[in-house]
Curated annotation (Swiss-Prot):
One of its GO terms (biological process) is protein localization. Highly expressed in the brain. CDD domains: FN3. Residues 6-115 form the Fibronectin type-III domain. Interacts with PHYH and ADGRB1. Belongs to the PHYHIP family. The gene is Phyhip. Pfam families: PHYHIP_C. Overexpression in heart induce atrial tachycardia and increased susceptibility to aconitine-induced arrhythmia, possibly due to altered expression of voltage-gated K(1+) channel and adrenergic beta1-receptor (ADRB1). This is Phytanoyl-CoA hydroxylase-interacting protein. GO terms for cellular component: cytoplasm. Keywords: Glycoprotein. Glycans are attached at residues 14, 325. GO terms for molecular function: protein tyrosine kinase binding.
Length: 330
């Protein structure tokens, strides 16, 4: 049987967090003969390995020949924000069950995308299921080392400047390494209604009245839901003043929440004043997208311990947790 030509001119497009479309060129004489495609897909950082996050999944994918371009989809071997290399081979299945194969094409590289809004909406729905009842609170707070606040006073005009979010949480979160903001907490102890006296982030705490960051002029976005191999679950929310750079970033990427009616964090008018509530059963991580003036709040030392084991800095999400994972790339 006549040999097959080697595929060439590979094109990759329509890339998502767990799929891509691929096409290539081959000789006209092969178009009606080819019965199968072999696709060799490897993580770029380890091209010679067949190890993906789940074992025993081959990187050489076999597909029946279909008109090109074709979509390759699968959350079991594709992860978000991950660089891959891909090469293709065409084949004709013969009567004896063996394959006549072409040579391998050139190798091309691409990077998968972030979670889209519909994926984040699925995470949001999962988070809502365990959020629990809403508790009142009155302040947002940020813990850090004393030197951090001294630096803000001395070198930053008494202002906490936004910084780039780390890679904690879901690997596919569009905020990781992209969104600038200042991290705050708002969870309270159910028996006192006050912020806890322990913190993983430092013994010095800046507290600011909730209405300074969260009010009807602020948009609230859902950004992530994750855990770190423990029973605790975290939800990341973004507070962005309407029309700000942070707001424009989030508008196209994150689900927008109704500030007065959602399962995580609310601001509503009751008897003429703003009342704030947070979900009891989630640890909320709040990202405020603008600079925060220290003069708007108070700074003091907490009496509790610094619980480093609870820090979420660059924390990796547990990919096996059924509570906080969805069926797309982790």
């Amino acid at each position: 049987m006549e040999l097959l030509s080697t595929p060439h001119s590979i094109e990759i497009n329509n890339i998502t967090c767990d799929s891509f479309r691929i096409s290539w060129a081959m000789e006209d004489s092969d178009l009606e003969r080819v019965t199968h495609y072999f696709i060799d897909l490897n993580k770029k950082e380890n091209k010679n390995s067949n190890k993906f996050k789940h074992r025993d999944v081959p990187t050489k994918l076999v597909a029946k020949a279909v008109p090109l371009p074709m979509t390759v989809r699968g959350h079991w071997f594709l992860s978000p924000r991950t660089e891959y290399s891909v090469a293709v081979q065409t084949a004709v299945k013969q009567s004896d069950g063996e394959y006549l194969v072409s040579g391998w094409s050139e190798t091309v590289e691409f990077c998968t995308g972030d979670y889209a809004k519909e994926h984040l909406a699925q995470l949001q729905e999962k988070a809502e299921q365990i959020a629990g009842r809403m508790l009142r609170f009155s302040v947002f707070y940020r813990n850090h080392h004393k030197e951090y606040f001294q630096h803000a006073r001395t070198h930053c005009g008494n202002v906490l400047q936004p910084y780039l979010k780390d890679n904690s949480g879901s690997h596919g979160s569009p905020t990781s390494g992209m969104l600038h903001g200042v991290f705050f907490s708002c969870n309270t102890e159910f028996n006192t209604g006050q912020p806890p006296q322990d913190s993983p982030y430092g013994r010095w705490r800046f507290q600011i009245p909730a209405q300074r960051l969260f009010n009807p002029s602020t948009n609230l976005y859902f950004a992530d839901f994750y855990c770190m191999y423990t029973a605790y679950h975290y939800a990341i929310l973004v507070l962005a003043p309407k029309g700000s750079l942070g707001d424009r970033f989030c508008r196209d990427r994150l689900p927008l929440l109704d500030i007065a009616c959602n399962k995580f964090l609310t601001c509503s008018v009751e008897d003429g004043e703003l009342i704030f509530r947070h979900a009891q059963d989630l640890i909320l991580e709040i990202i405020y997208t603008e600079p925060v003036d220290l003069s708007l709040g108070t700074l003091g030392e907490i009496s509790g311990h610094q619980l480093m084991s609870l820090s979420t800095a660059d924390a990796k999400k547990d990919p096996s947790c059924k509570t906080c994972n969805i069926s797309v790339g982790r």
